[in-house]
Regions:
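Catalytic cores and adjacent flexible loops of soluble metabolic enzymes
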Residues: 1-318
Length: 318
């Protein structure tokens, strides 16, 4: 597949931080940024800009907050752009510098469809400071179609560059990705639509390809799939698939060998039966993460069948 408009956004540090409370050493993050930059990755997302009133710096690493000084220790000006994510309702409006004074190019606003008004308000504030803005509608598999349509119609009226289709729970199959991709693209003329997939059913790469075929032009990936629970589409697969001469997979392969094989053994992201169960049942992974933690600590966790049965009774949207 070669389409020059397609861009890759690597979210290893941001999404992967959900597995280690963003406790990545700065020398490692610097190596990750440099490797991804040399690989030609278009955007490198280095974490969240979170309000310390909600998250204690004593319990979370620096990439939960992405202070400008910390970012400048690991990133540098190059063709790859720095991205940072913000959560609706967990962000201090006073924490943003004018874009001309920041190494950050884009902020991605993570929101649920029901909070789209707040997301647009935050996005407008960020946009007024000169940044690129993306809105990522989380948990699309839990959104009623009428609610999604209303959110997309509102986003169509903004001047934000990007809107993302997000399969937060790894629930979607190809038919749903194709249908939703067409919906987003039809409702958002003039905007670039992105896709972020989780690998609960080992479909993150396949579903990303389906999005590409339909016309999605910015793709989320992470090195070795690092991310919450089952993880994400892998950056290295995207680099190999896109056949764009600007991309070079070799720096990412070197990073995997140096850092991520060991980290995966320690943190246990990737396909596991409990994560698969939460995916096929369209459930938040908090329960499967708790199950896996109990197994790792030698605590009673129950059988897979017992876990499946327990998830059948869960009715929770967050």
């Amino acid at each position: 597949m070669y389409r020059p408009e397609i861009k890759i956004l690597d979210c290893t540090i941001r999404d992967g931080g959900l597995m280690n409370n963003w406790e990545f050493p700065k020398p490692m993050v610097k190596e990750v940024f440099d490797g991804l930059a040399r690989a030609g990755v278009d955007y490198i997302e280095l974490g969240y800009r979170a309000d310390k009133a909600f998250f204690s710096p004593e319990k979370h690493g620096p990439w939960r907050f992405c202070a400008e000084a910390d970012l400048r220790e690991v990133a540098y000006e190059c063709d790859s752009k720095v991205s940072v994510m913000v959560d609706v309702g967990r962000t201090d409006y006073d924490d943003f510098l004018p874009a001309r004074d920041s190494i950050i190019t884009m902020f991605r606003v993570a929101t649920y469809a029901k909070e789209i008004d707040k997301a647009i308000h935050l996005g407008n504030h960020i946009k007024s400071l000169g940044y690129e803005v993306s809105v990522n509608i989380m948990a699309a598999s839990h959104v009623l179609e009428i609610e999604l349509d209303e959110a997309l119609d509102q986003l169509a009226q903004t001047n934000f560059e990007y809107v993302y289709l997000v399969d937060s729970f790894g629930y979607f199959y190809s038919e749903q990705v194709q249908w939703l991709s067409e919906k987003y693209l039809n409702k958002l003329p003039g905007k670039t639509v992105g896709i972020h997939c989780h690998n609960n059913q080992q479909l993150a790469f396949a579903n990303t390809i389906d999005g590409i075929i339909k016309g999605i032009n910015i793709l989320d990936g992470s090195i070795y799939g690092m991310g919450r629970a089952a993880g994400n589409c892998t950056t290295e697969l995207l680099l190999g698939f896109l056949k764009n001469p600007k991309y070079d997979i070799r720096p990412v392969l070197a990073l995997i060998e140096k850092h991520f094989i060991r980290m995966k053994d320690e943190l246990k992201w990737g396909y596991e039966v409990p994560y698969m169960i939460s995916g096929i049942l369209n459930k938040h992974p908090r329960f499967s993460l708790e199950y896996m933690k109990n197994v790792a600590e030698g605590k009673p966790a129950g059988s897979f069948v017992e876990f499946y049965n327990s998830q059948m009774t869960v009715n929770e949207l967050d």
